């Protein structure tokens, strides 16, 4: 019998059922599945249940992809480059990102301020308001060099990502 599972449930199931644990909390975070972008599931024995979801357009994965685009890399394939740049920078813009772009709650839930992004309605990830926030234009990969600014932006979004995941884990 062929069965189709939801995107995030499939991620959670492949992590939980292949694990050595009888009980676990399973977090899944990525760009977007059907509509969910983030889930919290509880696994116990043979049962796995999603207990919390965050839906599109509020997505930690798409936030990271927005910074991938902003730093001049290709979305859905260049995120590892942003992660690789992060150790060379300082998270100078972490608080600005937390103040303006992502509203992170104590329970780990979050909402993105969509006025800075185009991914839900346009052909680009970010808009001019996003670039103005950091006083730098979107980097053109073929002509613009990577600078310390891009390394600091990478360190900043990496630090924000880590804070979001740790906040979710602790709640």
Language-model-derived ranges and their functions:
Residues 1-171:
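Short acidic/glycine-rich loops and adjacent helix/strand connectors
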């Amino acid at each position: 019998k062929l069965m189709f599972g939801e995107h995030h449930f499939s991620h959670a199931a492949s992590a939980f059922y292949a694990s050595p644990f009888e009980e676990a909390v399973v977090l899944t975070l990525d760009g977007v599945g059907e509509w969910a972008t983030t889930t919290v599931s509880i696994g116990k024995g043979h049962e796995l249940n999603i207990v919390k979801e965050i839906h599109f357009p509020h997505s930690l994965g798409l936030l990271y992809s927005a910074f991938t685009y902003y730093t001049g890399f290709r979305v859905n394939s260049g995120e590892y480059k942003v992660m690789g740049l992060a150790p060379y920078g300082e998270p100078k813009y972490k608080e600005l990102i937390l103040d303006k772009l992502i509203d992170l709650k104590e329970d780990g839930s979050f909402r993105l301020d969509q006025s800075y992004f185009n991914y839900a309605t346009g052909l680009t990830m970010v808009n001019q308001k996003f670039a103005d926030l950091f006083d730098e234009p979107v980097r053109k990969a073929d002509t613009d060099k990577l600078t310390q600014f891009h390394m600091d932006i990478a360190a900043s979004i990496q630090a924000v990502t880590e804070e979001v995941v740790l906040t979710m884990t602790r709640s």
